[in-house]
Amino acid sequence: MLAHLNQVTRIPPCPPFSGREARLKFHFFSWSTFMLSWPNNATLREIRTRAATNLTHHPHLVDTLYHASPQTPFLTRSGALYRFVTCCNCTLPNISIQQCKAGDRPGDLEIILQSNGGGRPASFQFPSSPTGSLLRCIVAASLLPEVSVGHQELSPLRSRSQGGQTDVRSGPDPARRLVALLRREDGAPKDPPLGPFGHPRGPGPAKSEDEESERRDAPPPPLDSSFQASRLVPVGPGFRLLVFNTNRVINTKLVCSEPLVKMRVCNVPRLINNFVARKYVVKETAFTVSLFFTDGVGANLAINVNISGTYLSFLLAMTSLRCFLPVEAIYPAAVSNWNSTLDLHGLENQSLVRENRSGVFWTTNFPSVVSCRDGLNVSWFKAATATISRVHGQTLEQHLIREITPIVTHREAKISRIKNRLFTLLELRNRSQIQVLHKRFLEGLLDCASLLRLDPSCINRIASEGLFDFSKRSIAHSKNRHECALLGHRHSANVTKLVVNERKTRLDILGRNANFLTRCKHQVNLRQSPIFLTLLRHIRRRLGLGRASVKREITLLLAHLRKKTAPIHCRDAQV
């Protein structure tokens, strides 16, 4: 009865196939399953869509890419490879694609980007694993037809003629001669196509069958393509940031009932056309609506809605208006302004975003530095926090990449990849910006782990399991009066305070994103504990490697702190 347990059952890595078509379907299913496991990202969606479209229309290329040996490089001239590789490094887990010059160190699983200007090509080496091999094939499929395996081009038309269709050539065969005669009609003059009213239609750009079929098979854009509450933007090698939409300003018009207009809506005299007649603040859903006069007072009302959230929240807000306004109909709405905010997590010397910069100006009524490029203003605050208005979507992402890349790649910039990965992960999990209390606690954990020579990557693993998750609606983190009113609290600005030297100090007095060095630089007049100086010396050793200016700044700060604390220590010793 136990004899069958002595036999070892071996399961083959691939199931037995009955034909070539079944094998191609299995490979395409494996690639599709791998692509569907990717996170939600605009660039990853582009890679997934282009690869699936090319492989669906040309299934004979699946075998060519799948059976290519790891030592055979893929060659391409498409500039989209840089963008695809950067997105994969920043978004896909356990993926690190190395970039080097082609020919220096030939390796396995590489894609060589050839320069169109005759320069030296660049090589991108994928990880030596099944996942890296699969990712290389998918990236190559998304770059078709500008890809070749070794010296063999993968043009779809050429591969199609080699895969199953016979190449039509003129010869002694009567069938070939007939096909050649019929093909001559393609070059003959023809009448222009007629338009919808019988008039000749003007000449347009020629469209291939592949483009038309791709347009027909393209999936419809998602409903949230024009609005994203948070957007992940990869900037530079391995640096990520999350941009959050704080609020939007939406303009529209209302049609009100005639008998109740004078009584409930516009019971004030009209001064000018854009005069605010009435202003309402609603707590749930939280929004502010302002009523304006129009020419047809009593029939139409122009409203201005300031709201944060999705379009579903906006529809709920418009429904809430019917509770206190005699609304009969609402005209189509238009978004007039977008406001977004972001934090540069992992930038140790945060003063770099405001110092020694050209093309910026200071505002007098608000302590911020405004950088103006392409007609768009980005306001930078003290703790590497920025706000940007008027743009959203892909335009916002491209403008932020142009704005932040010079800061991240500056020769004096000191970037902590561990902090950037940790704080970005928490913001991505909780869909809100990390709060002051959480950031200080986690930054202290990371610095103490580095001081005690422990592995700080374990904190990232714990955070990925949800141990450090937070809620933006908790009382100690919220400054929104609507949320505090919903929770039954009296004060709207109930931010956590600390008692230092018999004085209350707010945690966010230097900004939500203020790190250890920023607090040391602006709060040196307070009495500090001995562990404070120990951590500061350790940070000087850690950040001073190759950064003379940062080390010099911390050394001056240490000398200033010793001078401040010296009389206190002497007095304590006498007592």
From Swiss-Prot:
It comes from the Viruses. Residues 153-174, 186-228 are annotated as: Disordered. Residues 158-168 have a biased composition (Polar residues). Keywords: DNA-binding, Viral transcription. The keyword DNA-binding applies. One of its GO terms (molecular function) is DNA binding. Transmembrane segments: none annotated. One of its GO terms (biological process) is viral transcription. Pfam families: Herpes_UL87 (PF03043). Belongs to the herpesviridae UL87 family. DNA-binding protein that is required for viral late gene expression. Selectively recognizes late promoters by binding to a non-canonical TATA box element (TATT). Part of the viral pre-initiation complex (vPIC) that is responsible for the expression of vPIC-dependent late genes. vPIC is composed of at least BcRF1 that binds the viral TATT box, BDLF3.5, BDLF4, BFRF2, BGLF3, BGLF4 and BVLF1. This is Late gene expression regulator BcRF1.
